[in-house]
Amino acid sequence: MTEYLLLFVGTVLVNNFVLVKFLGLCPFMGVSKKLETAIGMGLATTFVLTLASVCAWMVNSFILLPLGLVYLRTLAFILVIAVVVQFTELVVRKTSPALYRLLGIFLPLITTNCAVLGVALLNINQSHNFMQSAVYGFSAAAGFSLVMVLFAAIRERLAVADVPAPFRGSSIALITAGLMSLAFMGFTGLVKF
């Protein structure tokens, strides 16, 4: 149990996918202008990352390794992610049409989110078992969602702040992301791997 807690804390805070590994920057910058959109994208990404992580582990363990097809790992994981995203899109469309309209093009773009593929590949490279893969996928998604929501809240405040003209828009957003990354560096000694 302690191992899973350390994996969770380490993935969410110490090795955050957005601020440390720089994966998932496209939705991080694109969907974080409004808090409600960031929360919706965070929830959708959490569902996709967790499910894709587990499915990718199963495809690798039960199909690719026994058949000696490990060279098809990236292609197989992309196909798994595409299926999971399509399933998620159907669920979101049926359960919350308003959220589906808010997320717009970003929901299908989860397929090309490098964080999702990165989690799947890192699970295999770090030799995680089934449960560790599920925890790692959920933790990566929780870290992604946490950073997204924090960043969206800051960007909403910056939208009404008196920011100098040269720094308005994406300039102040990048500066804010850099400062958030520095703040998360404070968690570096929290968990030793």
From Swiss-Prot:
Q: Which enzyme class?
A: translocase
What GO CC terms are in its UniProt record? plasma membrane
Write down the InterPro entries for this protein, in alphabetical order: Ion_transpt_RnfA/RsxA, NqrDE/RnfAE, NqrDE/RnfAE_oxidrdctase
Output the lineage of the source organism.
Answer: Bacteria, Pseudomonadati, Pseudomonadota, Gammaproteobacteria, Enterobacterales
UniProt entry tagged with the keyword Electron transport = yes
Pfam families cross-referenced by the UniProt entry: Rnf-Nqr
Q: Per the annotation, which location comes first and is thus the protein's main one?
A: membrane
Subunit record text: The complex is composed of six subunits: RnfA, RnfB, RnfC, RnfD, RnfE and RnfG.
Question: E.C. number, please?
Answer: 7.-.-.-
Q: What does this protein do?
A: Part of a membrane-bound complex that couples electron transfer with translocation of ions across the membrane.
Gene Ontology biological-process annotations:
electron transport chain
What is the protein's given name? Answer: Ion-translocating oxidoreductase complex subunit A
UniProt topology in membrane: Multi-pass membrane protein
Q: Where in the cell is it found?
A: Cell inner membrane
Q: Which domain of life is it from?
A: Bacteria
Its keywords, alphabetically, are:
Cell inner membrane, Cell membrane, Electron transport, Membrane, Translocase, Transmembrane, Transmembrane helix, Transport
Family designation: Belongs to the NqrDE/RnfAE family.
State which residue ranges cross the membrane: 5-25, 39-59, 62-82, 102-122, 134-154, 171-191
